[in-house]
From Swiss-Prot:
EC number from the UniProt entry: 6.1.1.17
InterPro entries: aa-tRNA-synth_I_cd-bd, aa-tRNA-synth_I_codon-bd_sub2, aa-tRNA-synth_I_CS, aa_tRNA-synth_I_cd-bd_sf, Glu-tRNA-ligase_bac/mito, Glu-tRNA-synth_I_codon-bd_sub1, Glu/Gln-tRNA-synth, Glu/Gln-tRNA-synth_Ib_cat-dom
Motif ('HIGH' region): 11-21
Localization in the cell: Cytoplasm
Record's protein name: Glutamate--tRNA ligase
Lineage: Bacteria, Pseudomonadati, Pseudomonadota, Betaproteobacteria, Burkholderiales
NCBIfam families hit by this protein: gltX_bact
MF terms in GO: ATP binding; glutamate-tRNA ligase activity; tRNA binding; zinc ion binding
Main location per the UniProt record: cytoplasm
GO cellular component entries: cytosol
Species, as recorded: Burkholderia ambifaria (strain MC40-6)
Chain sites annotated for binding ATP: 246
Keyword check for Cytoplasm: yes
Family: Belongs to the class-I aminoacyl-tRNA synthetase family. Glutamate--tRNA ligase type 1 subfamily.
Length: 469
């Protein structure tokens, strides 16, 4: 009988979470949703010195922003210490683990001798009980570590959903330390107990964990558990071809929100960063879940491409509802010093956003473009001298008069502009540039007729006439 699918995301809260980390949440989330299974969030916080609540909060915030909802959790390893100690005691009782009194200095000396002899450094089993073997006398006052009795013969085999069949000889594996001298269990042991207790069926994680897998499988089997399906994802590289990391300049997940990216764009981009469905580049979260499978996970490292993410974000911005974008743009406008009163008395923000979004790759860019509608213009003096010349002033005066009488629609404003151009034998830039400067304070705007309509007749006419006075 096939077990119900249960996946997990098990981050360590020791720093911010970047795109490479969160991809290891996205894929198991999508697989659980596709298979109508359960997605578990587990916080692996046994590294007490480096773990922090701030990092946990960042994980939760990032997942919430991207819509990666979990069915169980967060489950904290530090809250499961009694369970780990229970299993350790059981393993000692059953002879699956044993105390080892070899000091760190002795272990270092052993490894050095092995290296000098051209051997792979490894624990030599000095304290491993065997039939007929006489163990050394435990040194007084020394607390031992606990080691797992790894099988001495045979091979650990698993069919990795990404790497294919993997075989590791047990002769390559020494007896892993599973508890420190103070009794606290180590990471590889806790993971096994958690995966077993939580009935995890599929472990989708980065391939930096692949070396842990044979050890975890051996411990799991010793405890009577059934190994899950493993899928070890190739590394995500940054744009320089290095492993994505904080040290190499990776941004945190929430930094993308703060830069004006939409969560659906980030999810779409992350989905393609190591998985594919034919040539499909743009797809919804629902489509991704429907299509997702383990068979099409990439086998080579995926390289982050910021321009590709920006392209996707621009697409989703164009598709987004103006009211939603306006709400998202508001904090960016606040940061630009645009006051609520200016927005309340100025053009409708929804409409401004609707005009600006086709030119933007981020919500931040929308806000930067929208700010001109809520500021008193302060055009550059050199630009004014260049564009608002004596030759163009009569045309500006006629345009102001025409706009006073025109219907206030884009079509009517466009007609007034064209009529003024014809009367004064000017080309559009000769008139549009000074109008942009006087009304908006900049020469960089969308279509001039659309911009003027949003500013409103009174503002447009008064600003042109004030410059001519």
């Amino acid at each position: 009988m096939t077990r119900p699918v249960r996946t997990r995301f098990a981050p360590s809260p020791t720093g911010f979470i970047h795109l490479g980390n969160i991809r290891s949440a996205l894929y198991p989330w999508a697989f659980a949703r596709k298979m109508k299974g359960t997605f578990v969030l587990r916080i692996e916080d046994t590294d007490v010195e480096r773990s922090s609540q701030e990092a946990v909060d960042a994980i939760l915030e990032g997942m919430q922003w991207l819509g990666l909802d979990f069915d169980e959790g967060p489950i904290y390893q530090m809250q499961r210490m009694d369970r780990y100690r229970e299993v350790l005691a059981q393993m000692l009782e059953q002879g699956l683990a044993y105390p080892c009194y070899m000091s760190a200095e002795e272990l270092d000396a052993l490894r050095e001798r092995q290296r000098e002899a051209g051997l792979k450094p490894r624990y030599d089993g000095t304290w491993r009980p065997e039939p007929g073997k006489v163990l050394p006398e435990p040194p007084a006052g020394v607390k031992p570590v606990l080691r797992f009795r790894n099988p001495l013969t045979g091979t650990v085999v698993w069919d990795d959903a990404v790497k294919g069949r993997v075989e590791i000889s047990n002769e390559e594996l020494d007896d892993l330390v599973i508890a420190r001298p103070d009794g606290t269990p180590i990471y590889n042991f806790c993971v096994v107990v958690d995966d077993m207790d939580m009935n995890i069926t599929h472990v989708i994680r980065g391939d930096d964990h692949v070396n842990n897998t044979p050890r975890q499988i051996n411990i799991l089997r010793a405890l009577g558990g059934e190994p899950p399906v493993y899928a070890h994802l190739p590394t995500v590289l940054n744009e320089q071809g290095e492993k994505m990391s904080k040290r190499h300049g990776a941004m945190s997940v929430m930094a993308y929100r703060d830069a004006g990216f939409l969560p659906e764009a980030v999810v779409n981009y992350l989905a393609r960063l190591g998985w594919s469905h034919g040539d499909a580049e743009i797809f919804s979260r629902e489509q991704f879940v429907e299509w997702f499978d383990l068979e099409h996970l990439g086998k080579s490292p995926a390289q982050y491409d910021h321009s590709k993410l920006s392209w996707l974000n621009a697409h989703y911005i164009k598709e987004a509802d103006n009211a939603r974008l306006a709400a998202l743009a508001k904090p960016f406008l606040d940061a630009l010093g645009i006051e609520d009163a200016a927005i309340a008395t100025g053009p409708a923000l929804d409409a401004v956003v609707g005009l600006m979004k086709d030119r933007a790759t981020t919500v931040k860019e929308i806000a930067e473009g929208a700010a001109m509608f809520y500021r008193v213009p302060a055009p550059d003096a050199d630009a004014l001298a260049q564009h608002v010349t004596d030759a163009v002033r009569p045309a500006l005066a006629d345009l102001a008069a025409a706009l006073k009488a025109a219907d206030w629609t884009k079509e009517a404003v466009s007609a007034a502009l064209k009529a003024t151009l014809g009367t004064h034998k000017l080309k559009m830039p000769q008139l549009a540039m000074p109008v942009r400067l006087l009304v908006a304070g900049t020469t960089h705007t969308p279509s001039i007729d659309a911009v003027l309509v949003l500013f409103g007749r009174d503002v447009v006419v008064s600003r042109i006439e004030a410059a001519l006075a």
